[in-house]
Regions:
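Charged, alpha-helix-enriched surfaces in structured cytosolic catalytic cores
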Residues: 18, 22, 68, 72, ...
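Acidic, low-complexity glycine/serine/threonine-rich segments
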Residues: 54-100
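A short beta-strand signature
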Residues: 111-117
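Beta-rich nucleic-acid/ligand-interaction surfaces
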Residues: 96-111
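Immediate N-terminus of the mature polypeptide
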Residues: 1-65, 117-144
């Protein structure tokens, strides 16, 4: 049996960091996948709408829209996480468009995702950047 001192030397951060990194990578992958159903015109309450066959983020290109709405995209991100990321509690997930998003000439939008991991109860914070001309998300990793 191991010594109890070893238990106290292990920090919660060492366990939470790899899990947070894994969730962050998977969130970026999820958001960079496009829902197939968005282009097929299926009803949103159809069972396939939230199945793995329709995995991903809804299409952000909408006909007739010339302005990018960060709040609309933040809501879309939250709904995608609620549907397809089971490690985050959907009721405790918040996606916020950062204020520096609307700088003139910028082609990037910044989002902060705050959530709670379902089984461990740890808070998780992920910073994302969306290059909306290229149409892809990236994870902004914090420097140690």
């Amino acid at each position: 049996m191991s010594s109890p001192q070893l238990y106290y030397r292990l920090s919660a951060r060492t366990h939470a960091t790899p899990l947070r990194d894994s969730v962050a990578r998977d969130v970026v992958h999820l958001l960079n996948c496009a829902m197939r159903g968005a282009s097929m015109g299926m009803p949103s309450d159809a069972p396939v709408a939230s199945s793995v066959l329709n995995f991903g983020n809804p299409c952000m290109a909408t006909l007739g829209r010339s302005r990018v709405d960060p709040q609309h995209i933040a809501n879309s991100i939250r709904q995608t996480l609620a549907a397809f990321e089971p490690r985050l509690l959907a009721t405790r997930t918040l996606v916020v468009a950062r204020q520096d998003t609307d700088s003139p000439g910028s082609r990037a939008l910044y989002f902060d995702v705050h959530g709670v991991l379902r089984h461990q109860g740890h808070h998780i914070a992920i910073r994302l950047v969306l290059d909306y001309l290229g149409g892809f998300f990236e994870w902004i990793q914090e420097r140690p």
